[in-house]
């Protein structure tokens, strides 16, 4: 296996046995690809902006003498880059410019004669852009648009499973769901009549819709029924016989022909009888006249002579009708063939309940149902019906919908019109009737073939189209308003509705969410999340059990483990590792093709529908070296069921053992040994881990760590290979390899690192270089670690030495006992950065002012502010300290203009102002690490703002100069090369200043050309530098675009260092969570024979009942990994020769049962081996992939290699007494996370504070600095105890007795601890409520 440069530094021992056929795909592609489709120019106009424009344009005026046509669009460059947008609090977006053509036709001339054409580029608002990491910056905060799983458009056949009607009868229904437009439902009622609903309104008989499409009763019966023909001859009634139709009936007369009786009266007709009748080709039999009575006529029968209607279609024949028909000379009579078994008379029955009888009455009925209360006219009724399903503006099935529709009806072609045709509606009705007749199955709504993914691009396109449609109406009116000659396209289009629609979607849609940025994993998971909620989706309350449940089709598409606990369980899912969406938006997953018993490396992506037809072997099936199945019978999946199949039947095989789970779950080692509920908690809690000060790679991982860290975008990754030319804390410079540069560039890549920035969750984002000067790097190598990464691997927590044993009740109820060493070594110390903002507004009494001159505030309080009234950087502040001094004018009187003028001239400033400074919230303390001042254009900047500006300019200048210096050095090196090749001596050159080199002439013409080219580049470089500097300077010095009425915003960033303490929540990766109960001195912790104390003591009772045994296996393997590291460390300390080291490390990598990983240390140089050993001495990291991990034997071998007991248990001694514990204890290394539920954020206690306005009771909650509620049950408790005085003070002075509490406070201050309870305010509220009901209550004074 080839390792990149960073990977060579620390290779993870892999226990996986199955070869990796397919690399893990780029994990954010679902977001990036979808948005790319939205903004890229699509020549076919199938998706994205192009499709939206083409669907709305051209817009014609009502008169038809002008139209506005769409030509093309382009996206401009964003004004600010991503970082600037985040700092300034603006949206990262690009202007959309659309080229439109206004065509004006001659009014009098023949049609289509063009009078004038005007083309113009029109601005149509801003389109938010996606950053490289799949997020959007909206108003300065990073947001993610979550993909939605919704019901695919198409037609669905379903039943109520007997739940609607009390009899338990199963009622079937069909629903046509378009992408946009009205829903059309057909449903049976308990009497077996077929009804139709439009948009879930009241139901109408289904035949109304057929009549509205101009079908007569006769046409309808022809469509839905087979006929039976009777002939009247010689006073006998003959019936045309189709033997198959008699199956299962009882003969009501002798069936005879040619004098032979085939079935006697009263006998049941069996298959044998039918075969006999078919064999002898009996086509007509005589039936008794009574047999026809009750049959239904298939068409109208008219008396030719008189023109009167004897019998209308769909009427029952009685014997006298038969006589009249015979008299009128009708010799053949067609009746409908129905039976109770498989040819129900549903449509015939429905026609009887249908009140309409022609097209107009049907249209009127539909109109009345859709628009009750409006008088129907013929035109309005016709328009309404046409627009419902047959108009492309109002109805669209979409390509997906048409494909699903045609598949559902068993048609061959996949493409077709986006609107419904009459045949479509009739075929749906026919299929529904077939299902009611027992032919065909209903659909499974939760099958992933019936649910599709709607990603960012598609939702943004829909929103954009909504905006365009709003504009369309306005344009139509403008086009009709006369003077077109003076108008340009620009005057027609108002960009406001478009940008409003887009802004609303990105800013406040339910699926546009504030990005979860706790750590890299939470970012990635959030972007791969799939929600069934949101507009056009389900609601939490309505979603039943079935929708939330795991479905067989989730396999390899949606993770069965990772979903939130609580009301959203099963509605919010995570995409599986290898899943992707196909062109229609259905999820598909990769499989290896199996041909002639051999598994090939060819890979097919199958959607849920396609997968149902194949037999698919599992990823852990045993194969021989040629890829043939070893066992005769293989465990396979077919049609959602798992069972054994012979190896010849297998058609596909899973790609990887990880393909079932999501990224979050694939990071849990030994997942296969954990109970599902705990695995769910484990996957969810990894997302809440706070990045620690120094990341520590997990000793026991799964091999997915690198993919997650790199794909998440928190690390700096080399775009091109080269050598490290310069590195410091904030930038890395790479001299690019010659073969990767393109002609005429300096070949330098500069990576600026993010330093101590605030994330959405107030955690700290900081990048640190992990390469050193002169190191070679390749494309894709990790150059710098971000938060929670270690050498380019995800590192959410720390490897802790744990012991499973009780310890004096301190691990009761999952509590955790922690050693003081953990605090001393800062293992779980985290940095949290808070942003506090102070806004100075223009009030109607005058502007608020930011100043250090605050009334009634002492010197001490102002000691940390500079002269502008803003806190210094580096100041340590605590709750209540002033960060930004601000005063607000409080005027009783509004000033007259004269007074304002006098004030302005004489500057009487000290008039009424009140202190409204920004203070540090209660319970927060920290260090000020950054201050930013934003000033409105035209407002004078204060001293501090100018200082900040200057320092920013200095930084930028320094950066750009450094960049220029590096580029220059690169260029001059090439110039020197050309000059020396041209025959100039090196030492002469070096005596000349570099600028003079360019003036030298060379004899060789080709070399001279090269030199001139390089000189040109040098000039370009300098010009570019000047341009860049000027642009940056302009950006920094220009005023900021602030909200209306805001003059200044000052943002202060506080960094808080949080050490671990009792009350913090910690967890492992297996759902084993707990709260720290005590931090114990090192000397009191249990220790082993060598005197090494453990770091954490966990409760062994937390394991058996929860069935997450993965944590125990992880502990054992962690112990072995650490033991091997210790041995390597000892060898390094003894300075043994490299050969021995190489041999030992090689032995460790080769250990285990046929691992897929082949590490060949012979290809490593001694230097590389030493560096590897240096990185392994703290423990050899291992990978046990999900469902393909280390086995018990392998863990034992590892323990043996590390010279540790294979039981994984060791003897411990009590740190307090030095006595040995009575039995060996499981000790090992477990990866523990500190979760973002810190006691500092939760703990609070109220002394005095704010009160509710009406009831005058204290508020509740930490944010309001509220008290603890003493509710009615608590009152009962005090009553039960008879604690009268306690109860009295709870209900009065401690709550809402306003006078009593003020007096009480005074008394306590005076040292007098007495209370005089008065009237609680809530009693007055009660009185007022009773009086408002018109009952007067008066309180009598005693």
From Swiss-Prot:
SUPFAM superfamilies named among the record's database cross-references: beta and beta-prime subunits of DNA dependent RNA-polymerase
GO terms for MF: DNA binding; DNA-directed RNA polymerase activity; ribonucleoside binding
Stretch forming the signal peptide: none
EC category: transferase
A biological process term (GO) from this entry: DNA-templated transcription
EC number(s) stated in the UniProt entry for this protein: 2.7.7.6
Any one Gene Ontology cellular component term annotated for this protein: DNA-directed RNA polymerase complex
Keyword vocabulary terms for this entry: DNA-directed RNA polymerase, Nucleotidyltransferase, Transcription, Transferase
Alphabetical list of Pfam families matching this protein: RNA_pol_Rpb2_1 (PF04563), RNA_pol_Rpb2_2 (PF04561), RNA_pol_Rpb2_3 (PF04565), RNA_pol_Rpb2_45 (PF10385), RNA_pol_Rpb2_6 (PF00562), RNA_pol_Rpb2_7 (PF04560)
Top-level lineage group: Bacteria
Catalyzed reactions per annotation: RNA(n) + a ribonucleoside 5'-triphosphate = RNA(n+1) + diphosphate
Function as written in the Swiss-Prot or TrEMBL entry: DNA-dependent RNA polymerase catalyzes the transcription of DNA into RNA using the four ribonucleoside triphosphates as substrates.
HAMAP family: RNApol_bact_RpoB
NCBIfam families the UniProt entry points to: PRK00405.1 (NF001616), rpoB (TIGR02013)
Family of this protein: Belongs to the RNA polymerase beta chain family.
PANTHER family tied to this protein: DNA-DIRECTED RNA POLYMERASE I SUBUNIT 2 (PTHR20856)
Subunit-level organization: The RNAP catalytic core consists of 2 alpha, 1 beta, 1 beta' and 1 omega subunit. When a sigma factor is associated with the core the holoenzyme is formed, which can initiate transcription.
Protein name: DNA-directed RNA polymerase subunit beta
Originating organism: Proteus mirabilis (strain HI4320)
Source lineage: Bacteria, Pseudomonadati, Pseudomonadota, Gammaproteobacteria, Enterobacterales
